[in-house]
């Protein structure tokens, strides 16, 4: 086994070797024991969703499925994905997505894209805003509109990137719920290429 982080300056050895406490998983960083209402991805429980979230509420839940991606600068690929939309009673949705690359036979190859962010009601009826951060060094602000009670369209208003990130200049996304499943398509403009199809997936509700 490699040396890893043990003994690295600034990383306490006790923190790395602390035994598990047992019992239920307290969640990332022990968030479950904070003196705050827990967020939920299930509209059947507490807390009550904020009234301003009404146009976004069909998204609340945990969704999992598969998708396909491609771009002129890369080979086509298949991926699995889980997406979670949750709320804590305030007027925004907490969004998190994790994806993994799949082989031709459906086996999991390795972790892929991750996203975290917030979906917020906009200034006018039927409008909303989305803030997303990516570990690839990209941060995006989207402006969106409700196309129907179960369809949401959003396009980037701002794309900011770290000095080491690849060039991404714009994205457009369309989400829709069809026959109980969450479908989406993503168009991307990046690395000198114009806006064009990049991702498409179908996710089934697994919780909420």
Label each PLM-derived region with a short phrase.
Residues 76-80, 111, 166-169:
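Amphipathic hydrophobic-ligand
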Residues 80-86, 115-120, 141-145, 170-176, ...:
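Hydrophobic/aromatic beta-strand elements that line small-molecule binding cavities or substrate pockets
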Residues 98-103, 133-139, 159-160, 187-192:
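Short, solvent-exposed aromatic-acidic interface loops
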Residues 103-143:
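Helix-adjacent hinge/juxtasegments
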Residues 135-140, 146-149, 153-172:
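Acidic, glycine-rich flexible loop segments
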Residues 162-208:
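Mixed-charge, glycine-accented linear interaction segment located at domain edges/termini
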């Amino acid at each position: 086994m490699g040396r890893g982080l043990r003994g690295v300056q600034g990383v306490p050895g006790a923190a790395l070797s602390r035994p598990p406490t047992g019992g239920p998983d307290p969640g990332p960083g022990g968030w479950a024991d904070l003196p705050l209402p827990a967020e939920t991805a299930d509209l059947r429980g507490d807390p009550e969703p904020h009234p301003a979230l009404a146009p976004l509420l069909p998204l609340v839940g945990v969704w999992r499925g598969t998708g396909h991606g491609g771009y002129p600068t890369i080979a086509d690929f298949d991926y699995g994905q889980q997406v979670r939309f949750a709320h804590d009673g305030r007027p925004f949705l907490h969004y998190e997505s994790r994806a993994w690359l799949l082989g031709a036979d459906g086996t999991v190859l390795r972790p892929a894209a991750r996203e975290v962010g917030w979906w917020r009601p906009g200034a006018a009826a039927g409008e909303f805003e989305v803030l997303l951060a990516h570990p690839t060094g990209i941060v995006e602000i989207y402006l969106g509109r409700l196309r129907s009670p179960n369809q949401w369209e959003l396009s980037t208003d701002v794309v900011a990137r770290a000095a080491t990130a690849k060039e991404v200049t714009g994205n457009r996304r369309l989400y829709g719920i069809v026959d109980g499943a969450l479908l989406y398509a993503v168009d991307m403009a990046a690395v000198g290429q114009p806006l064009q199809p990049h991702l498409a997936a179908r996710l089934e509700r697994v919780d909420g």
